[in-house]
Amino acid sequence: MDYKTAGVDVTAGRAFVERIKSCVEKTHKSEVIGGLGGFGGCIRIPKGFESPVLVSGTDGVGTKLELAQQYGCHFGVGIDLVAMCVNDVITNGARPLFFLDYIASGTLTPDALAEVIEGIAAGCCQSDCSLLGGETAEMPGFYPSGRYDLAGFCVGIVENHHLIDGTKINCGDQIIGIKSNGVHSNGFSLVRKVLSMANVDENTLYGKDKRNLIQSLLEPTAIYVQLVEKLLRENLPIHGMTHITGGGLPENLPRIFPSGLLPHIDITTWEITEIFNWLQNAGDIPEIDLWNTFNMGIGFCLIVPKNEVNSALEICMKNDFEAWNIGQVVESQNNSKHSGILGIPS
């Protein structure tokens, strides 16, 4: 009996690292010290910072992985993994500095996992972020053969006096909603349940444009890094930012609001993405559950002063992101921090 017989092929693992080396190193910026394969990844703090603050974020892709693996779509979930982390980090005004990944599988499937890494590298390039390292764990008997799980970790950097944490949000500020690519990476346990009820396959079409359903559901999460960087470079006074993930607008938007203030949303200001209408109809999902599970077409939000709305919308449009003024900041009645959100079905 040896390790390979027990289900772990160390030689294949080494070959896999060599296979992915070039696409990983393409993400490396000048601050990276050394290459892939060491025990730790090393990176310099970029020049020009006087009082840098490091901002960290970690996340996964959830059960979207189940659907992706079912249909053999591995590249996109690599992008998803990066997006879920970097979109969190930028809400504090930080720019992503480096990314780490963790891949656990039942047995090493080099072709599928190489696609995942290529997707992660592509997401890092979109985010101007170095893929500094990672871990690939082969765990036979723990994960089924051919299955894998992903986790990501990102660190960003921002000047202390440029840190955005929501404390500057004021009554009367406006809320800018930036369009999502669809479902992104949250709510897929409900999505998969609906799919099993609706008896769909890889050829199922939906909506007035007859789009492929599975392809739409697996569309990678939008990465908002470059857009936020452009907004900050224009010195737009952003008082708060939120990444709309699990729990939708009702769960995520109030998280950054100071005590005594609430977001008041007008849901008629944007057109709900068709995929959510299909899910609601196919699964007979109550409207309240729809809003409390999915992003409903809004993937990221900015809170800005009223007189900066047009500037914010113009910058979004110039960078090919649809955006709308979807609401405003109002005073709450009970002065509690997490007292919810107004204007959304509850």
Swiss-Prot record:
Keywords: ATP-binding, Cytoplasm, Ligase, Nucleotide-binding, Purine biosynthesis. This is Phosphoribosylformylglycinamidine cyclo-ligase. It is an enzyme of class 6 (ligase). One of its GO terms (biological process) is 'de novo' IMP biosynthetic process. Its EC number is 6.3.3.1. It holds the Pfam family AIRS_C. Gene3D superfamilies: PurM-like C-terminal domain, PurM-like, N-terminal domain. One of its GO terms (molecular function) is phosphoribosylformylglycinamidine cyclo-ligase activity. The gene is purM. It comes from the Bacteria. Belongs to the AIR synthase family. It catalyses: 2-formamido-N(1)-(5-O-phospho-beta-D-ribosyl)acetamidine + ATP = 5-amino-1-(5-phospho-beta-D-ribosyl)imidazole + ADP + phosphate + H(+). Pathway: Purine metabolism; IMP biosynthesis via de novo pathway; 5-amino-1-(5-phospho-D-ribosyl)imidazole from N(2)-formyl-N(1)-(5-phospho-D-ribosyl)glycinamide: step 2/2. One of its GO terms (cellular component) is cytosol. It is found in: Cytoplasm. It comes from Prochlorococcus marinus (strain NATL1A).
